[in-house]
């Protein structure tokens, strides 16, 4: 039977509960345990699919097509276990399910209340389908005291009494701020946070304390005394230069030992952390550096590109180089020459996005990369803009555009109205809802034998990648574009949907309709990112 670890947060948001959960999951895995990680999000949206990138950050897409919180990306990257739609739930989804049952009459006329109906639904989600796992780590979004989070805290309070004694522990992630004028770390915010947590019936077993400096013994003693935890359970979570240094740091601080002790499990062998040590050595001691320009639409919110940033770092690990990122808002290129911004970079990456704002700037970035022989990686929207650039400037289709931006006489990119998923035909229309209606999740693609992209993937001709898009390149223009050098080297198995384009006579120019960054891991870098960084490294030696 699985044991449950609940990770809560206090004092301030954005302390890194998702990263802490992922790091602890990796440590337990390294001890030979099988782990599952889940995220509870208290917001009323059904999922983050229609939320602004500036408010939510990245939407992480799973193989089975769920649009989820970006923390699930941390879970996958640290443990290697693919997340599913059953690993993330929101208040909105819970309420939708409850109200559907109420309309159906499932509650037999009962008054529907937060307790017990909402809390029971949360508990059912937490404990469902956990057979075969040793530990289930559950992160509760937000901070203790948030009104919207109260049903979740009540549910995890109840669940300790529902399960056998000793099967549940609580870890509270908090902040110890340093006050320069006083010259000391302050424990009072943490004491108040734990007091709030205890007032709703939850006594934390472990305090994970974010800090930028060592915690003095006296402060540990004080936290243990006033928060009612053992002094050994006050774990120092020091700021790290790399997120991949966190598992080793947490182990050195005793987190995994304390977790096992809280469950009364005798630690037999130390965790096998050799692979973590190896990648951290590569990160700390690179043999070179490359600069990649990310020409995006949401560069003011780096979390909107979280998996992309990590995938590029994985490409750097694979090539033993540091990847430096130069963030450029694509709208800049609509009024200014891109050359001064891009002449010094070793590669250009144009990521996904939605809407007309900044689209022309992305087209200019693709043109610069093509004409100057700079490695170019276009992802989703970035591929579509590269195709429009080729149509306008190589094939002479001056009015080439996307119907996403409005009516156009030359629809190089258009709305997908139907596609095949498994054995079923999916259909969409312009009048449909926005939420949950895109082409989402893992789909197969067939690669052209002998193409550059096939070589990047190791010579295979069949791949599976995750998608999140509503628009697709129009195959009616395929022959004209190929006559001018832009090759369609990857297609859906039925030959209907273009998946990959490339230039054969360019050092490295690849556009993909899918999101390869979602499947990259520090120990298994995605081949496209490893190859792109390698091409950037070659380019860096030419200038």
Curated annotation (Swiss-Prot):
Q: What EC identifiers does the entry list?
A: 6.3.4.2
Instruction: List the GO cellular component terms.
Output: cytosol
Pfam families in the record, alphabetically?
CTP_synth_N, GATase
A GO BP term here is:
pyrimidine nucleobase biosynthetic process
Check the record and name the CDD domains matching this protein: CTPS_N (cd03113), GATase1_CTP_Synthase (cd01746)
Q: Where does L-glutamine bind?
A: 54, 353, 381-384, 404, 470
Entry binding sites for Mg(2+): 71, 139
Q: In which pathway does it act?
A: Pyrimidine metabolism; CTP biosynthesis via de novo pathway; CTP from UDP: step 2/2
**Annotated stretches, region: Amidoligase domain:** 1-265
List, in alphabetical order, the Gene Ontology terms for molecular function in this entry: ATP binding; CTP synthase activity; glutaminase activity; identical protein binding; metal ion binding
Report domain Glutamine amidotransferase type-1 positions: 291-542
Gene3D superfamilies in alphabetical order:
3.40.50.880, P-loop containing nucleotide triphosphate hydrolases (3.40.50.300)
Which InterPro entries does this entry report, sorted A to Z? Class_I_gatase-like (IPR029062), CTP_synthase (IPR004468), CTP_synthase_N (IPR017456), GATASE (IPR017926), GATase1_CTP_Synthase (IPR033828), P-loop_NTPase (IPR027417)
How is this protein activated or inhibited? Answer: Allosterically activated by GTP, when glutamine is the substrate; GTP has no effect on the reaction when ammonia is the substrate. The allosteric effector GTP functions by stabilizing the protein conformation that binds the tetrahedral intermediate(s) formed during glutamine hydrolysis. Inhibited by the product CTP, via allosteric rather than competitive inhibition.
The active site lies at 380, 515, 517
| Positions annotated to bind CTP | 13, 146-148, 186-191, 222
Query: Which keywords does this chain's UniProt record carry?
Result: ATP-binding, Glutamine amidotransferase, Ligase, Magnesium, Metal-binding, Nucleotide-binding, Pyrimidine biosynthesis
Q: What class of enzyme is it?
A: ligase
The protein's annotated catalytic reaction(s) are: UTP + L-glutamine + ATP + H2O = CTP + L-glutamate + ADP + phosphate + 2 H(+); L-glutamine + H2O = L-glutamate + NH4(+); UTP + NH4(+) + ATP = CTP + ADP + phosphate + 2 H(+)
HAMAP family linked? PyrG (MF_01227)
Q: What does this protein do?
A: Catalyzes the ATP-dependent amination of UTP to CTP with either L-glutamine or ammonia as the source of nitrogen. Regulates intracellular CTP levels through interactions with the four ribonucleotide triphosphates.
Similarity section: Belongs to the CTP synthase family.
One further remark on this entry is:
CTPSs have evolved a hybrid strategy for distinguishing between UTP and CTP. The overlapping regions of the product feedback inhibitory and substrate sites recognize a common feature in both compounds, the triphosphate moiety. To differentiate isosteric substrate and product pyrimidine rings, an additional pocket far from the expected kinase/ligase catalytic site, specifically recognizes the cytosine and ribose portions of the product inhibitor.
Summarize subunit and interaction data from the UniProt record for this chain.
Answer: Homotetramer.
Its recorded name reads CTP synthase
Q: What is the gene name?
A: pyrG
